[in-house]
């Protein structure tokens, strides 16, 4: 059985590294430190030009929960259309109602826009904050998504193994379960063997020092605990290590 490896990235350097490491698909985001937000149109367009493998854009207009207002929804619709215009192959989204159920009317609306633009759809980890994952599985099957990205309702996919295995059974081949969050070369094979998933999702994250010669530590561009002179990047060796381990 061939296992698909999806790598989430938030910069073009990481895109090159993910491809070099053997990724099968890219989840394109901005701000992975916030869980992944919508990438810019320029980022989408350049990724489409570079990548020989499918690229799916995250459609998440802000950090926080998955309950969106009309302005958020309008932005999401425009971003789905932008993904098509940029030349990408798919999008990734997830929307909930205030009670934690899948927002089916909105999901169906976004799904139609994606389908009309010939874009594949992954339903993302909003399912990990839903009220009833078994009901959500049926909702997502009804929508016609290709897959669900999930940690099995846990902090990481390894801790969610039992729920992931149940999700695979409930999906019953109607769509794929994409196991993600904390997947590494050390645990990927066990996650696959114990759950039956055919796809895994990881960042293979590492860092590199800035190439700046002038370093002004006293000036911060964001949160005080972030070092602006350390650049987060995907490590191609970590992706390859996972690929070799799960052969």
From Swiss-Prot:
Gene (name only): cutC
Pfam families attached to this UniProt entry: CutC
Signal peptide: none
Cross-referenced InterPro entries: CutC-like, CutC-like_dom_sf
Localization annotation: Cytoplasm
GO molecular function, one term: copper ion binding
Keywords per UniProt: Cytoplasm
Protein name in UniProt: PF03932 family protein CutC
Source organism: Aliivibrio fischeri (strain ATCC 700601 / ES114) (Vibrio fischeri)
Family as reported in the entry's similarity comment: Belongs to the CutC family.
Annotated GO CC locations: cytoplasm
Keyword Chloroplast (UniProt): no
């Amino acid at each position: 059985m061939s296992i698909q490896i999806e790598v989430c990235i938030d910069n073009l350097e990481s895109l090159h590294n993910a491809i070099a490491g053997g990724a099968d698909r890219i989840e394109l985001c901005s701000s992975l430190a916030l869980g992944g937000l919508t990438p810019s149109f320029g980022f989408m367009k350049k990724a489409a030009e570079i990548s020989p493998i499918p690229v799916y854009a995250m459609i998440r207009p802000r950090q926080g929960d998955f309950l969106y207002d009309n302005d958020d929804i309008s932005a999401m619709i425009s971003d789905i259309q932008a993904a098509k215009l940029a030349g990408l192959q798919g999008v990734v989204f997830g929307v909930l109602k205030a009670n934690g159920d899948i927002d089916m009317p909105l999901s169906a609306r976004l799904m139609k826009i994606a389908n009309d633009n010939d874009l594949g759809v992954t339903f993302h980890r909003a399912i990990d904050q839903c009220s009833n994952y078994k009901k959500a599985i049926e909702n997502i099957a009804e929508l016609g998504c290709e897959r669900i990205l999930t940690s099995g309702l846990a902090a990481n996919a390894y801790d969610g193994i039992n729920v992931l295995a149940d999700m695979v059974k409930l999906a019953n081949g109607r769509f794929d379960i994409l196991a993600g969050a904390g997947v590494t070369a050390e645990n990927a094979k066990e996650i696959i063997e114990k759950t039956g998933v055919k796809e895994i999702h990881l960042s293979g994250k590492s860092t590199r020092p800035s190439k700046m010669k002038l370093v002004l530590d006293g000036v911060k561009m964001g949160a005080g605990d972030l070092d602006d002179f350390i650049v987060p990047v995907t490590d191609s060796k970590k992706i390859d290590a996972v690929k070799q381990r799960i052969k």
